[in-house]
From Swiss-Prot:
NCBIfam families: PRK14186.1 (NF010783). The keyword Nucleotide-binding does not apply. PROSITE patterns: THF_DHG_CYH_2. One of its GO terms (cellular component) is cytosol. NADP(+) binds at residues 165-167, 190, 231. This is Bifunctional protein FolD. Homodimer. The keyword Hydrolase applies. It catalyses: (6R)-5,10-methylene-5,6,7,8-tetrahydrofolate + NADP(+) = (6R)-5,10-methenyltetrahydrofolate + NADPH; (6R)-5,10-methenyltetrahydrofolate + H2O = (6R)-10-formyltetrahydrofolate + H(+). Keywords: Amino-acid biosynthesis, Histidine biosynthesis, Hydrolase, Methionine biosynthesis, Multifunctional enzyme, NADP, One-carbon metabolism, Oxidoreductase, Purine biosynthesis. Pathway: One-carbon metabolism; tetrahydrofolate interconversion.
Length: 303
């Protein structure tokens, strides 16, 4: 039987560590960590994700400075809001919820966030720190994947890793983190020819392509470890329609095809998703400890 990499359980364990770090530092810090999540417009998926993050803040005692901004906000207006949060001493982390409306310059806005308050690890300076192996905020989803692998004692060093997807949000930083852990890494993408022949060579396969059910039985080798980063809502099939069931969650991987073949896999939901939110909290608490002159007791949680 394959090992199921339970991100929900691990996220709860790490949240407890973060909560304890906050409580032990309050006497010196005189304030709780602060996280500002900026949501622009009314994208339903973004609303769900922001709600998850606010609930997570409540659970561990992080103060939320969330802002829900109008769809047609200008680049200048949003930049000014970010600048004011950069100056706000009670805010330790800033996250710009992506995707943004098409009229906004994502790169310019990410650059406007203080790198020291970059809770999502996407500022160019922090991506550069990742390349150089220097400490700093880390991209949340790849950091969550690394934690999931480490806590389940899955060896990375010397392994052949294939990352499907090359986004700045997941694919590229994921490849860098695996390389730093001494894996031999290949990145596949939408222009890769004969994807199955490449992915079958992987000891560790991380799929972040954003395409439901892209990877199936013919893409994986025996005893491979598969990490499914994707999450999608599929319309109910005919059987579910009769039962009036809602849409169905799935990932980029056909788990039902591969589960008897692989050594371990992350489920959807309950795998990478909870870890992404927890690493956002870890980045924020780490920044809070730094800003308040506290011992950096949780930095080991970040790759």
């Amino acid at each position: 039987m394959p090992k199921i990499l339970d991100g929900k359980k691990l996220a709860q364990e790490i949240e407890l560590i973060l909560q304890q770090a906050i409580e032990s530092g309050l006497e010196v810090a005189k304030r709780r960590p602060g996280l500002a999540v900026l949501r622009v417009g009314d994208d339903p998926a973004s609303g769900v994700y922001v709600n998850y993050k606010e609930k997570a803040c409540d659970r561990i005692g992080v103060r939320s400075f969330a802002k829900h901004l109008k769809e047609d906000i200008s680049l200048e207006e949003l930049t000014e809001i970010i600048k004011s949060l950069n100056e706000e001493k009670n805010v330790d982390g800033i996250l710009l919820q992506l995707p943004l409306p098409s009229h906004l310059d994502e790169t310019a806005l990410l650059r406007s966030i203080d790198p020291d308050k970059d809770a999502d690890g996407l500022h160019p300076l922090n991506l550069g720190r990742l390349i150089k192996g220097e400490k700093g905020p880390r991209s949340c989803t790849p950091a969550g994947v690394m934690s999931l692998l480490e806590r389940n004692q899955i060896k990375i060093e010397g392994k052949r890793a294939v990352v499907v997807g090359r986004s700045i949000l997941v694919g590229k930083p994921m490849a860098l983190m695996l390389e730093a852990a001494n894996a031999t890494v290949t990145i596949a993408h939408s222009k890769t020819k004969d994807l199955p022949s490449l992915t079958k060579e992987a000891d560790l396969l991380v799929v972040a392509a954003g395409k439901p059910y892209l990877i199936g039985e013919n893409h994986v080798s025996e005893n491979c470890v598969v990490i499914d980063v994707g999450i999608h809502r599929l319309p109910p099939d005919e059987e579910n329609m009769k039962e009036l069931k809602k849409t169905k969650l799935c990932g980029d991987v056909k788990i039902f095809e591969i589960e008897d073949k692989v050594a371990a896999y992350s489920p959807v939901p309950g795998g990478v998703g909870p870890m992404t939110v927890t690493m956002l909290l870890a980045n924020t608490v780490d920044r809070w400890q730094k800003h308040c002159g506290l011992p950096l007791t949780i930095s080991h949680l970040l790759p």
